Regions:
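Extracellular secreted precursors and ectodomains with disulfide-bonded cysteine-rich loops/domains
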Residues: 40-41, 55, 98, 109, ...
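Short, solvent-exposed, Trp/other aromatic-anchored flexible loops in extracytoplasmic proteins
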Residues: 98-140
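N-terminal prepro-regions of secreted/extracellular proteins
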Residues: 1-57
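Active-site-adjacent substructure of cysteine-protease-like catalytic cores
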Residues: 225-289
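Noncatalytic regulatory segments and standalone regulatory/sensor domains
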Residues: 260, 271-324
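Cysteine-nucleophile protease catalytic domains, especially the papain-like/related folds used
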Residues: 142-227, 310-324
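Short, surface-exposed binding/anchoring microloops in extracellular/periplasmic proteins
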Residues: 34-87
Length: 324
């Protein structure tokens, strides 16, 4: 009997060791799906290769507490495609990779990650598509854990945008009345908030060791300085720091009235664009929060800066931004 027990124990121990030494299974690749119904997204531009359109988006849940990455592709004809998809967070947040294998079809398809908690300071997704055997430049979208605030008075867009900026960074946002006093909004002609007063007010609520805000004029009539200004906006967003911009509200696509004499602040919190071979990002769209009603909108970069912001400050050729 003892011999049988020893033999049984030997078998069981061998089985346990065998279980321990079995190699881990590789991560499962994603699968292509039909297009999902999306509600709130921040997306890269739609690019086209050989008649096949593609883009990547950050999709947020209804209360903007969770996010996932979605890669969309729309073939113009039967073709093969695949995608490598990545979702990551600034700071020490998680870094999630997924991929959908080669598929041949003429139907629209989407590859996406699972929803995960949205974290500060920012979230990024990037997708690299292989289409008809050729890898494309990666497309990217970045956004933040937005905490949009609605201005409490008709001329408090400045305090509302500053409050949105601080809350989105993760700082307990002070009352708009306090911000309006510090910005001297009520002491200015027409009750306006002057851009030069904004950086010091924002910086008074953040540590001196953190990125400090400043304001500047971008000379948009010069291609080189215009691109440099866009790069500085991208740099600030890539730090998880929103950017405020002065605009003529009636020229915004979501406004329904002409306001040639009014000025207004909106807050840029994200972008969508393409990643070039040298690693630089060229955005084609911005995601903005409008304090008029605490709404979010996507807008073409040139539409915002060239067709709108450049007319808001001195009437010609320069846009005013507040950024880190």
């Amino acid at each position: 009997m003892q011999r049988m027990i020893r033999a049984l124990l030997t078998i069981l121990m061998g089985t346990a060791l065998a279980v321990i030494t079995v190699p881990a299974l590789p991560a499962q690749a994603g699968i292509w799906h039909e297009y999902p119904t999306t509600l709130n997204t921040t997306c890269s531009e739609t690019r086209v290769h050989n008649g096949t359109a593609y883009q990547v988006c950050l999709e947020f849940n209804g209360n903007r507490t969770q996010v996932r990455a979605v890669a969309f592709i729309n073939p113009g004809a039967y073709t093969n495609f695949q995608v490598n998809l990545r979702l990551w967070f600034g700071g020490d947040g998680p870094d999630i990779s997924d991929s959908c294998p080669t598929m041949t079809t003429n139907a629209s398809r989407a590859c996406y990650t699972a929803f995960t908690d949205l974290r500060r300071p920012y979230v990024v997704t990037e997708a690299k598509f292989g289409i008809a055997g050729t890898w494309q430049l990666p497309v990217r979208a970045l956004d933040m854990r937005l905490s949009a605030k609605q201005q409490e008075r008709g001329n408090w867009c400045g305090p509302g945008a500053v409050q949105t900026t601080l809350a989105t960074i993760g700082i307990s946002a002070p009352p708009q009345s306090e911000l309006a006093d510090k910005l001297q909004t009520g002491e200015t002609l027409f009750g306006a908030t002057m851009p030069g007063r904004i950086p010091a007010v924002i910086n008074s609520y953040i540590p001196a060791s953190d990125w400090q805000y400043k304001w500047e004029e971008i000379a948009v009539s010069n291609g080189q300085t215009y691109e440099a200004g866009i790069n500085r906006i991208v740099t600030s967003l890539s730090r998880g720091r929103p950017v405020m911009v002065l605009v003529i509200p009636g020229k915004l696509p979501w406004w329904n009235s002409s306001t040639p004499t009014l000025r207004h602040y909106v807050t840029i919190t994200g972008y969508g664009g393409v990643v070039h071979a040298d690693g630089s990002v060229h955005p084609t769209t911005f995601k903005v929060a409008d304090p008029a009603d605490a709404s979010e909108h996507s807008i073409d970069v040139d539409k915002l800066l060239l067709d709108n912001a450049n007319l808001a400050w001195n009437g010609i050729d320069s846009a005013v931004i507040v950024r880190t």
